[in-house]
Amino acid sequence: IGSKYDSANIESGTSKLTPYSTVTDKIKSASCTYKTIGDIVIVSATVKMNAVSLAGNSMCPLIDLPYKCISEDNVFCVGISNLGKLFKFAIPKNNTWLQFSTQDKTAYTFADGEQINVICLYKIK
């Protein structure tokens, strides 16, 4: 475990994010890297999609973030795909889920292998 911390006591690591059972056919893979700095974690996630459509009001939940979000409110971040589409990401309070939908709430069809990147910060202590 000592190799996960640097001299400033900042923990770094990687984590595989698991698509929730209702969206396993939509997501090819999902993972993240993270750093903890005091009571905050910075998560940089990458989601690779299959060639599927997402309805305008649909959410794609991923589970297994490295730390539970203990913020008083849900945390929101914006992600972008390699094709330029924007996505709204949310981490519900008291949870280890990262979920996303299209930012403009319109339906969207992903290209096979389209990649979404997002960086979120949230409170863990």
Please identify what each model-predicted range represents.
Residues 1-29, 71, 114, 121-125:
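Glycine-rich, low-complexity segments
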Residues 2-3, 50, 64, 89-92, ...:
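Beta-strand-rich, repetitive solenoid scaffolds
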Residues 19-26, 30, 58, 99-102, ...:
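Nucleic-acid endonuclease domains
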Residues 26-82, 119-120:
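Beta-rich globular "head" domains
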Residues 31-36, 87-93:
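Short, exposed beta-strand/loop patches in secreted or surface proteins that constitute
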Residues 52-57, 89, 109-112:
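A short, polar/proline- and glycine-enriched secondary-structure boundary/capping micro-motif
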Residues 92-125:
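Surface-exposed interaction regions enriched in Ser/Thr/Asp/Glu
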